[in-house]
Regions:
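Conserved "repeat-terminator" motif of extracellular CCP/Sushi domains
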Residues: 34-44, 106-124
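Surface-exposed interfaces of beta-sheet-rich extracellular modules
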Residues: 78-106
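C-terminal beta-strand-rich structural cap/linker in extracellular carbohydrate-active enzymes
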Residues: 113-123, 749-778
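Catalytic-core region of carbohydrate-active enzymes that cleave or remodel glycosidic bonds
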Residues: 439, 443, 504-512, 579-648, ...
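Glycoside hydrolase catalytic-domain groove-lining segments
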Residues: 446, 519, 526-614
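Glycan-recognition and catalytic regions of carbohydrate-active enzymes
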Residues: 620, 631-702, 727, 738-739
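Carbohydrate-binding surface patches
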Residues: 684-726, 730-733, 768-774
Length: 778
């Protein structure tokens, strides 16, 4: 029958059946309606994205996988199987959620509605951290390597951070531990410390090791010898000096110093007429009262420098002054070189100053140039120094009659173009520092022929050999960009090293004029070791590694086998060891022998001065040992003048400065170390240093022994060519009592046996100690 597009329905009623027909006027169809589709959304947790999930079967768009989060479309009733990755971003699969059923990484979904499923992952977990060795002893003065074992689940991190803790209530340092678990012991040390390793992934998980710190057992030390019959040279009393900066009268008196220096950056521009100075780059280039020169309180009715001379005279110490060579002095007590009103955008300001003085740097820390030096300062020439010396002679007498003994020719030309760049922006040259030095020295000597002059007061290894102009030119000259790379100034002066040229010119002046203008070759020697990337100078004692580096680096003053990578060979092209390499080898500085050689070659008769140095650790016994070693070296090596520069207020640094008391006031009655050096040797200077001297006032042999180790050492001290006249007096300074040098029981001196001229003592030298022995001699 032909389909006419009719719809037929059978209507059933009570006992009746009706056939209903409805026919349309157009054509008809029998195509079924489209199937229903649903969306399957796939998420992930930990991580929230990027997890690869595969789907079977493919969806209606022929897609079978994706990276979370993503969606698939399926017809109603479709049965879909999803498979997730077992790990994602190092995290482990844990479960599915939203599935019809799931089994491990497989998720089954029947698509009867829009459905969202989530693949859940868990991050790696840390279960525990253990530290080995645990427990363990650690001998003071050594290092211990610790390892950490981290346990956990998943792709966890084994990284840890290391710390070391002192016992609760302890004020002693626990030592240090580096990022790799290498522990360095402290001294002085608590009885125990705890080394802790903490997981970087989960800081709630850590492990520890109990460390017992033990002193080394008493051991036999090296043989020591002092030859009373071998007097090598007189020891200058002026090696026991300090800089006046922050030096209070009590410290100066108790340490019985012999000379005090008015020096440092703030003294370069001191104006004696107005008693004002400029702080230079040290503090915002500010003018201020003259007390800025030494940091001491003002004395009524007296200029700062005059007050220092008066104070020094009271305790019997000589005064070493500083006269300007760089050409400027402060003109008042309030101006500054870079006030905010003139330079409104600087990196830093001193808002405590009414002028809001700036640091002379732009906001990006580039240097401001072209400032007017006359805002703060007055230009002066050599006659200024001469007039000042004449004034001082009138006030205090000539040097020969108790006045100012020595004058430094300014301070550290090396840094004039940095520290004093507001008035001296250009680096110094050979001619400037030499010619101005000669002219200023002549003015000083004319005003006081009995005064001594010291110069060039040079800091910085490279400026011993090159002018600062050379050094800065070298820094910008390839391929090495090194201090020696462009030595035009040196080349224009016959290739002569700067210090030697300086000496030669003063020698030439004397030869032509029969007048010595330079009495001391003067250097600043900040040559303390660098340890773990930091200088040990101007710091606290540190761990035993730092302490040992500090003590070892005193060798820089004398030892031909000691080198430091900071001090390379000068590398001038005519040097016999010159190399074109940009990494020339280190050179042993041998500072005092080097100075002595320069003088012998270039200006015989010139004395040797080091009027700034600092080895740090001064709050501790370690600083005292280093300072005592330096003073002993100064005496043994024949230095003529030395003045220590403080870390901070000397009264708070007395453990370190007690080294001066060892040599100048060991018994509290101003008894001193001898004044005539005796040949003295130690079989191991790194363990026990020994310095001997004859005290000519009473014929006693004085000996200083420094135990640099962390254990007690017994040693035989042989006194050659000495017959004792009684027992030895013994004085000890150690960590057992940092407040005082303590008298010990007398020590028997065994006289020479028949056929010998050598007496002996057999003391025990406590760990980290300084011992003074006074042996009466027939």
């Amino acid at each position: 029958m032909r389909n006419l597009g009719c719809t037929v329905a059978v209507l059933m009623g009570t006992g009746l059946s009706l056939l209903a027909t409805a026919c349309g006027g157009g054509g008809g169809t029998n195509t079924p309606p489209p199937p229903t589709t649903y969306v399957l959304t796939v998420h992930s947790v930990t991580p929230a994205s990027g997890v690869v999930v595969t789907a079977t079967p493919t969806d209606i768009n022929n897609v079978s996988n994706g990276n979370t989060s993503f969606s698939l479309s399926y017809n109603s009733g479709a049965k879909v199987t999803l498979v997730a990755a077992a790990t994602a971003n190092g995290n482990n699969f844990s479960s599915w959620s939203g599935c019809t059923t799931s089994n491990g990484i497989t998720c089954a979904v029947t698509m009867n509605a829009n459905t969202t499923v989530t693949a859940n992952y868990t991050g790696p977990t840390i279960a525990s951290v253990t530290v080995a060795p645990n427990p363990t002893p650690a001998t003071i003065g050594t290092q211990v390597q610790f390892t950490a074992t981290v346990s956990g689940t998943g792709s966890f991190s084994s990284d840890v951070t290391w710390t070391v803790l002192a016992p609760s209530g302890s004020t002693l340092s626990p030592g240090t531990i580096n990022a790799f678990g290498l522990y360095t012991t402290p001294y002085p040390a608590p009885a125990t410390v705890t080394v802790v390793a903490t997981s970087t992934q989960d800081t709630s998980k850590s492990g520890s090791s109990a460390v017992t710190l033990v002193a080394p057992a008493t051991a036999a030390g090296p043989a020591l010898t002092v030859d009373a019959g071998n007097q090598t040279h007189a020891i200058s009393p002026y090696i026991y000096g300090m800089n006046a900066y922050l030096l209070d009268a009590d410290t100066a008196k108790n340490t019985n110093i012999t000379i005090s220096r008015w020096g440092g950056d703030s003294t370069s521009r001191y104006n004696y007429i107005k008693d004002v100075t400029n702080s230079a780059a040290d503090w915002y280039f500010e003018n201020g009262d003259g007390t800025g020169g030494d940091g001491m309180p003002a004395v009524s009715g007296m200029s700062a420098f005059d007050a220092l001379v008066t104070s020094n005279n009271t305790i019997g110490a000589k005064t070493l002054g500083t006269v300007p060579v760089q050409g400027w002095v402060a003109k008042d007590n309030y101006q500054c070189s870079f006030p905010e009103t003139t330079y409104p955008i600087q990196y830093s300001y001193d808002y405590g100053n009414p002028l809001h003085c700036g640091d002379g740097e732009n906001s990006d820390q580039t240097k401001i140039t072209g400032n007017d030096p006359t805002v703060t300062s007055t230009a002066v020439g050599p006659s200024w120094a001469g007039d000042w010396v004449a004034y001082l002679v009138g006030e205090f007498g000539s040097a020969a009659n108790g006045g100012v003994a020595i004058y430094d020719l300014d301070n550290e030309p090396s840094w004039w173009d940095a520290t004093h760049r507001d008035v001296h922006p250009s680096p110094f040259t050979y001619d400037e520092v030499t010619n101005n030095g000669i002219a200023t020295a002549l003015a000083v000597k004319t005003a006081d022929p009995t005064a001594a002059v010291s110069g060039p007061v040079m800091d910085y290894w490279w400026d011993y050999f090159y002018s600062k102009q050379d050094v800065e030119s070298g820094w910008s000259t390839g391929p090495c960009n090194a201090p020696w790379s462009s030595p035009l100034d040196r080349s224009n002066h016959n290739g002569t090293p700067l210090i030697e040229y300086y000496l030669q010119q003063f020698a030439a002046y004397e030869a032509a004029n029969n007048l010595r203008l330079l009495d001391y070759l003067d250097l600043h020697t900040y040559f303390a070791a660098t340890y773990n990337g930091h200088s040990v100078a101007f710091t606290t004692a540190g761990d035993t590694g730092t302490q040992q580096a500090r003590l070892n680096s005193t060798r820089v003053f004398w030892d031909p086998t000691y080198t430091d990578p900071n001090f390379l060979q000068p590398n001038y092209p005519t040097d016999p060891n010159y190399t074109t390499s940009c990494s020339p080898p280190a050179q042993a500085p041998q500072l005092i022998p080097m100075m002595r050689t320069w003088v012998a070659n270039d200006y015989p008769g010139t004395k040797l001065a080091i009027d700034e140095y600092n080895w740090g650790g001064l709050e501790s016994i370690n600083g005292a040992l280093a300072q005592a070693d330096i003073l002993g070296i100064f005496g043994r090596e024949g230095l003529d003048l030395g003045t220590f520069w403080p870390t901070t207020h000397p009264s708070t640094q007395m453990p370190g400065l007690t080294a001066f008391t060892i040599y100048r006031n060991y018994d509290g009655a101003n008894s001193t170390f001898g004044d005539m050096a005796l040949a003295s040797t130690s079989a191991d200077q790194a363990a026990l240093s020994v310095y001997g001297a004859l005290r000519t006032s009473d014929n006693a042999v004085t000996v200083v022994v420094i135990n640099k180790t962390y254990g007690d050492l017994t040693a035989t001290l042989s006194l050659a060519n000495l017959t004792p006249n009684g027992a030895a007096k013994v004085f000890l300074y150690s960590n057992a009592n940092l407040a005082a040098i303590v008298a010990q029981p007398d020590l028997t001196v065994t006289p020479p046996p028949t056929g010998s001229t050598t007496s002996t003592l057999n003391p025990t030298f406590p760990a980290q100690s300084i011992t003074v022995l006074v042996v009466p001699k027939t």
